Amino acid sequence: ETKWDNKSKMIPDTDINKNPNVGIGKDSDESYVFIYVKNAIVKDGEDALAKTPYFTLNANWSPVVDDAVGAKTNGNNNQYVSGLFMYTAGVPGVSAVLAPADDKAAYTGELFSTVHIPAVMNNTDVVDNPAMTVSCYIFGADQKGGETGAAANALAQAKKWAEKQA
């Protein structure tokens, strides 16, 4: 995260720079990449989702659909608050392989570029130690396992991993 400042102030109706990006080294195997975002900023309660900071995905990423660990919105399209996301290289809904080329590392591009602090959030809504934790899961692209293909296996394994992050 090249723009993240851990001392950023959460001011209602503003954006905070936060730009998670995943890379693999030039000698790495081709891989599927997943990111889980855990948003532990706002207390549970009435209208908690409307008060929860959210982000909008960039083009190389898609939400994972899953009742337990899937991407969650605040009720508005493309305003994500948490969950599992997959690298798609710009093809919505289709897992893509991240592969180093020309003896150089490869990067996914930012999952999102900013986090928006809703205008309705105030200091009484925030937990004592607010945090938005972004974790990455990288899975070798040649591992089919018991699934129909490597992409399906990567997704199944990422969902199991995400359960431990939630």
Name each region found by the language model.
Residues 25, 38-42, 60, 137-139:
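Short glycine-rich beta-strand segments
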